[in-house]
A protein has these predicted regions:
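Solvent-exposed loop/turn segments connecting transmembrane beta-strands
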Residues: 44-51, 202-213, 292-296, 320-330
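Long, hydrophobic/aromatic-enriched structural stretches that serve as scaffold segments
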Residues: 75-151
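Outer membrane beta-barrel transmembrane domains
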Residues: 31, 99-100, 223-340
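Short glycine/proline- and aromatic-enriched beta-strand/turn motifs that initiate or cap beta-hairpins
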Residues: 24-66, 91, 97-100, 261-263, ...
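Outer-membrane beta-barrel "beta-signal"
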Residues: 55-58, 118, 216, 329-340
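Transmembrane beta-barrel strands of outer-membrane/channel proteins
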Residues: 32-38, 87-95, 138-144, 184, ...
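Bacterial Sec-dependent N-terminal signal peptides
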Residues: 1-26
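Short loop/turn motifs that connect adjacent beta-strands in outer-membrane beta-barrel proteins
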Residues: 22-29, 64-85, 127-135, 188-197, ...
Length: 340
């Protein structure tokens, strides 16, 4: 009896300690994101309304405490046995316009009117021990009039009393968008919990876009480790005990990138559409005359601020021209995240 009683007390103490630790470390499992790309959002106050002019996206990301039963998820790359796997579903609409949206005529030496609407299923798989990740996105959607980009832009411009876009009758034609996008990232260096240096590479394959990209990424500030998973980058579960109150993140991101593009349906038209329109009784091909630039350089920089379950980010993208003979371009992204 003298032996059993101390053992029972020790076991009860251990169970209580484990329960308290679980309460302190319990992680969130859901993240909802509202994501807005717009070239009017500009950190230098020089907004425009041209080229890649808008992208609106809604995402639901989630983790599971058991292997996914969805057969597609089981086939996607995982970052090892100890990986943190974040699944996601997204809906996005994007639009491109030429510089002068008051003209009704086709403008061959500028970006064509184009719109896309698509659903994305994703798996972001992070290995917190070996500091690498695999991120896979499966994209399915449409481009052309079926994407309703013209109606969306016209409605918003009417709502804010801005000039009406007049050239959507010349937009690139209907076409299916099917793509797989894969990203691999690896941490190269870090300093305590304040600085991380990460390298990444991307491959895009499908009817929407074909190409590759490489980039370094630097994060500086008060932040959770990047490879602890996507959700932890934008929120912190409510802590207890000695961890109580540690729910703030504030950090900057710098990410230059070089991209080689082989095809891009939203810039040059899809595989199955001839992109001809009847203009004044003549069949005219309404897509840019000069073709794609193969190599595009860009710089992404901005900041993330997270307080508890809510966070916001602003990222500015400055890019060299995507089409030969046109202009460089800047797009701002403002996103809000709620984690639970």
């Amino acid at each position: 009896m003298r032996t059993i009683l101390p053992m029972l007390l020790l076991l009860a103490s251990q169970l209580l300690t484990n329960k308290q630790l679980y309460a302190q470390q319990q992680e969130d499992t859901r993240l909802f994101r509202v994501y807005e790309d717009n070239d009017f959002l500009n950190i230098r106050g020089k907004g425009t309304d041209e080229a890649y002019t808008n992208g609106t996206r809604f995402d639901l990301f989630y983790t599971k405490n058991h292997p996914s039963s969805f057969v597609v998820d089981r086939k996607l790359p995982h970052a090892g046995d100890s990986s943190i796997n974040v699944f996601g579903w997204s809906l996005m609409q994007v639009m491109f316009t030429p510089q002068d949206i008051t003209k009704t005529t086709f403008q061959p030496d500028d970006y064509a009117y184009a719109g896309g609407l698509f659903v994305t299923h994703s798996l972001y798989s992070y290995n917190p021990e070996k500091k690498y990740s695999y991120q896979t996105e499966l994209l399915l959607g449409v481009m052309g009039p079926m994407a309703l980009a013209g109606q969306a832009q016209t409605f918003v411009h009417h709502l804010i009393h801005y000039k009406k876009p007049m050239g959507w009758d010349n937009q690139l034609g209907d076409d299916p968008l099917i793509n797989i996008n894969f990203t691999a990232e690896k941490q190269f260096a870090s300093y305590q919990k304040w600085i991380e240096v990460i390298g990444g590479g991307q491959v895009f394959y499908g009817t929407a876009m074909n190409g590759v990209a490489v980039y370094p990424m630097v994060r500086i500030g008060i932040m959770h480790p990047y490879f602890n998973g996507y959700l932890s980058q934008y929120g912190t579960a409510k802590q207890k005990g000695e961890h109580k109150g540690h729910r703030v993140q504030a950090y900057i991101i710098v990410k230059p990138e070089a991209q080689v593009t082989f095809t891009n349906a939203l810039l040059e038209g899809g595989l199955f559409s001839d992109n001809t329109h009847d203009i004044s009784g003549k069949e005219v091909v309404t897509k840019p005359a000069n073709g794609l630039r193969t190599i595009v350089y860009s710089a992404n920089y901005g900041a993330v601020v997270a307080l508890g379950n809510f966070s916001m980010s602003f990222i500015q993208n400055s890019s060299s021209p995507w089409i030969k003979g046109v202009y460089s371009h800047e797009v701002g992204n403002f996103s809000m995240y709620f984690v639970w």
